[in-house]
Amino acid sequence: MNIQLINESDFTERFYDICEKWKLKHNPSSNLALVQTNERLELRKLNQPKLGAVAVNFVDGKMSYRRKFGGGRNEAIVKAVGVKGSYTPTIIDATAGLGQDAFVLASIGCYVKLIERNPIVGALLEDGLQRAYKDLEIGHFMRERMVLLPHSSITGLNPDLDSVDVVYLDPMYPSKTKSALVKKEMQLFQQLVGCDLDSDDLLFPAQQLARKRVVVKRPNYALFLANKKPDFCKETKKHRFDIYLSH
């Protein structure tokens, strides 16, 4: 993976262990850097410092605000996965990224298992989860409801042993416009991860694992995953959720 590994913390051994676990190698010529500070693990673009750093933070900031003041059970993603009344499905988020969608679902009572294929993103996500587990306000439900699995793809799971109610997919998709307003997370992610060119291959294994439905988040302008028409869609201003029911 093309990235610099920089330790700015007092936790040299911990940072070494993270790099070993995720098989990260230092590349001194990269303009992307994974940086361990005393507070967190973060991603920086060294040649564009004004972008700031990207880190996973469930405890405060925008994710905390969304949990407290967002739509809750009225959020589109919550409706898309089938939450209704006292029913909260078990979910695999197979393209977890920074864990933001999974956090919304866990916050309203869903049990979410996360899979992230990119090791740098996986390291960031694990760091954010570990800090959230220790938080007095949200730690109790985070430890129960958000778990990062030691797999890089759902293809490594066994449908007989690992099935859940819902599999959620949100693969990276090319941006329609080169807008200067693209979020810093997306700018860094697009350089780090690129687009998921093999995302079509996720639909079939997802359907094998999902007892009730597969939910695919797409930009409104995007084609259906694997060119397969869903049973129905739920649309928002910029995105839609394509829903494939298990038959």
Swiss-Prot record:
Organism: Glaesserella parasuis serovar 5 (strain SH0165)
Main location group: cytoplasm
The family this protein is said to belong to: Belongs to the methyltransferase superfamily. RsmJ family.
Species lineage: Bacteria, Pseudomonadati, Pseudomonadota, Gammaproteobacteria, Pasteurellales
Superkingdom of origin: Bacteria
InterPro entries (UniProt xref): 16SrRNA_methylTrfase_J (IPR007536), SAM-dependent_MTases_sf (IPR029063)
Recorded name of the encoding gene: rsmJ
Name the record gives this protein: Ribosomal RNA small subunit methyltransferase J
Record-linked SUPFAM superfamilies: S-adenosyl-L-methionine-dependent methyltransferases (SSF53335)
Residues that hold S-adenosyl-L-methionine according to the record: 116-117, 152-153, 170
rRNA processing found in the keyword field: yes
Pfam families xrefs: SAM_MT (PF04445)
Keywords of the record: Cytoplasm, Methyltransferase, rRNA processing, S-adenosyl-L-methionine, Transferase
